[in-house]
């Protein structure tokens, strides 16, 4: 698969882009990551794919249930099938690979766990210059049939990964200012500066 054994002792990972090679700390990774739906044809190395999947494996889950399972989709015809099975992710057919994140709905926190694992995969990918985007809208029965998803698991989130077809550096995020989002001690109390 993607290398059953991986090294866990690296503190910093290298990010490879067309423009530069740089170490990113967690905050920089969060601050510079964009959702990208337009991918180039450049292949992602098996080592980088392994790191992305290893990040998923290492993510914490509620009560340490580790109830999630992952279907890796790489073949072009299956990526196209995945795009057809979506209601909002037609762009995934252009991804280098995609991950169908399956969770067990018997755990009330399964959606939170799905978000946690996807964020870890996306940030790990971006650390290597690999962009990504997710979608949740699917034709459930069709997706289950096409990818043999068992009835006890939900296809909760699908993430497509690839190198961006366009330049990603220098873009600015459109985010609300912190003082419109955060309150001090009680809702409505402005943050003290």
Regions found by a protein language model. Give the residues of each.
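Acidic, surface-exposed loops and disordered segments
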Residues: 2-193
